[in-house]
Amino acid sequence: MFYKIAQKVMFQMDPERAHNLAIGSLKMTGNSPLNAFYAQNIAPAPVSFMGLTFPNPVGLAAGMDKDGESIDAFHAMGFGHVEVGTVTPRPQPGNDLPRLFRLKPAKAIINRMGFNNKGVDNLVKNLIAKKTDIMVGVNIGKNKDTPVEQGKDDYLICMDKVYPYAAYIAVNISSPNTPGLRSLQYGDLLDELLSALKTKQLELAEKHKKYVPIALKIAPDLTTEEIENIAQSLIKNKFDGAIATNTTLTRDGVSGLANANESGGLSGKPLTELSTKVIKQLATCLNGQIPIIGVGGINSAEDALAKFDAGATMVQIYSGFIYQGPKLIKEIVEAYRLK
């Protein structure tokens, strides 16, 4: 009930202003009695993933809490994990405003944020400051002004800094809003990046005496052959996990709607089937060797179950969470427990 009232107010506001207000409010209330407005008790439904045990299979996707400011509030809502970021080595403002658009009739969102964040050092401070023991994945990317050919260095810098504080590290090479970024998903550039990250991971595991898994986040806009090549590279470089998928550049299911022609990545309900299809193809190619987090267009427990059936071990929500509220977490966990 509270969320429906809050949502009604927020949906009257500019989307990015509403987002910033929400994150600020959650930051202030995460560890106070005021979190009773959104906190919920969710019975455990433990799941093993990448050698870790999560209290339930529902996580918050990257992009909601880029700088890790409201982690404790999302813990109170019952998420099994939170993925913060995307974070870059240096702070950057992202793309010009406006850059976030609701497509309410389609339960969708278009964003061209462009990795706006306060930088990896600021994120590390927030990871150290969090009060709860929730599992936090850190999604890392490259700065916009770093040439793609040198992008590998940005990922290594971020990995080095977040490694001691992350439950796992997600490598984002699939955002459509950083020029040239998606080219890292193909051929030699992909292989070189994954190889360098794996080498760095093993060095850091030795240094910190703990093994932090690494996962690759991929786009939905890939051919079958491209998915096969990515899967082969993941297996070859002994990556621990995959996250499928990021937002799409297609506009299927939203044509004619206000804001549908805005550039950027489309998320939400129109992405549901495409994302599930990619998960299924990727799972087939990986053949059980590497587990998958399914994300993209989960608007109901049924959508989440379809991701599990396609081959995902865990799921993440973002747009569906904005449209449905915290109750969606509980609904998915309960459906998962019964499946």
From Swiss-Prot:
Binds 1 FMN per subunit. Keywords: Cell membrane, Flavoprotein, FMN, Membrane, Oxidoreductase, Pyrimidine biosynthesis. One of its GO terms (molecular function) is dihydroorotate dehydrogenase (quinone) activity. Pfam families: DHO_dh (PF01180). It catalyses: (S)-dihydroorotate + a quinone = orotate + a quinol. GO terms for cellular component: cytoplasm; plasma membrane. This is Dihydroorotate dehydrogenase (quinone). GO terms for biological process: 'de novo' pyrimidine nucleobase biosynthetic process; 'de novo' UMP biosynthetic process. It comes from Shewanella sp. (strain MR-4). Pathway: Pyrimidine metabolism; UMP biosynthesis via de novo pathway; orotate from (S)-dihydroorotate (quinone route): step 1/1. Its EC number is 1.3.5.2. It comes from the Bacteria. Catalyzes the conversion of dihydroorotate to orotate with quinone as electron acceptor. It is found in: Cell membrane. It is an enzyme of class 1 (oxidoreductase). Monomer. The active site is at residue 175. HAMAP family: DHO_dh_type2.
